[in-house]
Amino acid sequence: MTRLILATRNAGKITELRAILADAGLTHDLVGADAYPDIPDVKETGVTFAENALLKAHALARATGLPAVADDSGLCVDVLGGAPGIFSARWSGRHGDDRANLDLLLAQLSDISEAHRGAHFACAAALALPDGTERVVEGQLRGTLRHTPTGTNGFGYDPVLQPEGETRTCAELSAEEKNAISHRGKAFRELVPVVRELLG
């Protein structure tokens, strides 16, 4: 069985990706980057989600000699011109501080009416092989931003995005419900046939 490295150390994301890929029928041995603690984090210097996903996937594939899958994702708010976008995880200035990022975003949108609170989650999922072969696919989840966080599931901005056609936020959905409609779920389900094509 081919080992496939998931280019993240985020435990929540590893769990989510394993579930999405397993549900899509991928049977490869999926291992998080946390299994390789000596490999340094990659600087996300790209200007798009796709560029950052490819940077991470290539770095891990080169360092391990194994195929690697990475994603870059974030929240794009219409009234903010697509921000925080690629800066979603460090919007408050502290990388990975979900609460601070969420608080800053809500403060920035405090005077914005419901009609102008449109946003979407975006995800670029990339596969890189040690020989340099690469593929990238993208997915989106459109919705509206609530004024206050609701729900305890998920992570990041999940407590404020209410997907189109839903009455609950992403953080109120079960993992299965969220994965079925999420930006990450869409992108990684699209990546599965690419993995099968390139890795067998």
UniProtKB/Swiss-Prot annotation:
Mg(2+) binds at residue 72. One of its GO terms (biological process) is nucleotide metabolic process. The keyword Nucleotide-binding applies. Substrate binds at residues 8-13, 73, 155-158, 178, 183-184. The keyword Magnesium applies. Keywords: Hydrolase, Magnesium, Metal-binding, Nucleotide metabolism, Nucleotide-binding. It catalyses: XTP + H2O = XMP + diphosphate + H(+); dITP + H2O = dIMP + diphosphate + H(+); ITP + H2O = IMP + diphosphate + H(+). It comes from the Bacteria. Disulfide bonds: none annotated. One of its GO terms (molecular function) is ribonucleoside triphosphate phosphatase activity. Its cofactor is Mg(2+). InterPro entries: dITP/XTP_pyrophosphatase, ITPase-like_fam, RdgB/HAM1. One of its GO terms (cellular component) is cytosol. Belongs to the HAM1 NTPase family. Pyrophosphatase that catalyzes the hydrolysis of nucleoside triphosphates to their monophosphate derivatives, with a high preference for the non-canonical purine nucleotides XTP (xanthosine triphosphate), dITP (deoxyinosine triphosphate) and ITP. Seems to function as a house-cleaning enzyme that removes non-canonical purine nucleotides from the nucleotide pool, thus preventing their incorporation into DNA/RNA and avoiding chromosomal lesions. This is dITP/XTP pyrophosphatase.
